[in-house]
Amino acid sequence: MATITQPKVEPTTLSNEEVLRYSRHLIMPEVGMEGQQKLKAAKVLCIGAGGLGSPLALYLAAAGVGTMGVVDFDVVDYTNLQRQIIHTTEDVGRKKTQSAKETINAINPNVEVVLHNVRITSENALDLIRPYDIVVDGTDNFPTRYLTNDACVLLKKPNVYGSIFRFEGQASVFAPHLGGPCYRCLYPKIGRAHV
């Protein structure tokens, strides 16, 4: 069985405020100073700022990821508010990316948030994903999941995938460039009923 390793990111120094902020991480042997420095140096692309992307972005910000790209083309709707916890009532009608950026920076002003207020397509997927170390797929449809997977495979980027359906959830890390399968390896064909 192949061993999956961490993405290669250069450690960076932490300020005194960051040492205090991340002190609970720093005392964990699995993270420590080196791990926290790698988190700060990491560039993560979060595709989707909805029901799954919202908590993903919040936890990544709280954990201290240094740069987070947020991809979404939609605006906040009242029907989003009960599950898309990164948005508030005051955000209704605003772009999800802008709402997400403000909440992320309210939680952790040290995170550089890069907004991609677009729909991910076959024309822009490679350019969107290329600058990042790892992709977090918080999308809610199969065509976008396959597109994200294919771009990550081509660019040799780890793809952290998650999905939610009612009270069930799935999560996986796909890194075929490190010897594991990809999303398309597990689900080679999409049924017409799911498109």
Locate predicted features:
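Adenine nucleotide-associated cytosolic modules
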Residues: 1-192
